Regions:
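Extreme N-terminal, non-catalytic leader segments
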Residues: 2-42
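Hydrophobic anchor at the beta1->P-loop junction of P-loop NTPases
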Residues: 46
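P-loop (Walker A) phosphate-binding loop of NTP-binding proteins
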Residues: 49
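ATP-binding Walker
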Residues: 52
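Walker A/P-loop
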Residues: 55
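ATP-dependent small-molecule kinase phosphotransfer cores
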Residues: 73-148
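ATP-dependent NMP and nucleoside kinases share a basic, alpha-helical "lid"
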Residues: 136-144, 152-185
Length: 195
């Protein structure tokens, strides 16, 4: 595909390289993603560590009529038995990471994925493209509705390369002690478990 001329609307934006999101280019032709450079919708990337206050900022965005797309909700959707993602996870980590209904068994998947850096990288290399594809579908749907601004709430915004489609990045930060207190309160766990 030829590089498009940069316009004020697309300045600073680029289409993802095929090597970055091979899964997406496998499912759609490059011209099908051209709408990303022509979008009339501002995309805000919202990220930060757990307990920093991303959910609070996301609620503020929603209160100001900014459509919020939540990465965790997308993961729940792609983990459904109807998605190809669980089968791909089983091929990588073994069938024991799936429940009888074909959905991932999160504790078993976490145990397998967090057993090594390589396995965690493998998990991310499988899940992130599925999440990105669904995110792009949702953004395209919002653009069709005339939505002017979308916020994408994603703890792994940079790790998944989702930042590449964002016009603005908002990173929510808080002191570690504040985050630990919030995590303990939110999840009902002891401070040692929050570490």
């Amino acid at each position: 595909m030829k590089a498009e001329k940069s316009t004020p609307l697309t300045q600073g934006c680029r289409l993802p390289k095929a090597s970055e999101w091979q899964f997406i280019t496998d499912l759609s032709e490059p011209q099908d993603l051209r709408w990303l450079t022509l979008k009339k919708c501002r995309i805000i990337g919202l990220t930060g560590q757990t307990g920093a206050g991303k959910s609070t900022v996301a609620k503020l965005f929603a209160e100001h009529n900014i459509k919020v797309i939540d990465a965790d909700s997308i993961v729940h959707k792609i983990y459904s038995g109807a998605s190809v993602c669980p089968k791909t996870l089983a091929a990588a980590f073994g069938n024991e990471v799936l429940n009888l209904d074909g959905t991932p068994n999160r504790p078993r998947l976490a145990k397998a994925a967090f057993s090594s850096k390589e396995n965690l990288a493998l998990l991310n290399s499988i899940v992130h493209p599925f999440v990105m594809y669904e995110l792009l579908l949702q953004i395209k749907s919002e653009i069709a509705k005339g939505t002017e601004t979308v916020a994408y709430d994603a703890p792994q915004l940079f790790e998944s390369n989702s930042d590449l489609i964002c016009d603005v990045i908002v990173s929510v930060v808080a002191e570690k002690s504040v985050r630990m207190q919030r995590i303990c309160s939110r999840d009902g766990i002891a401070p040692e478990a929050a570490e």
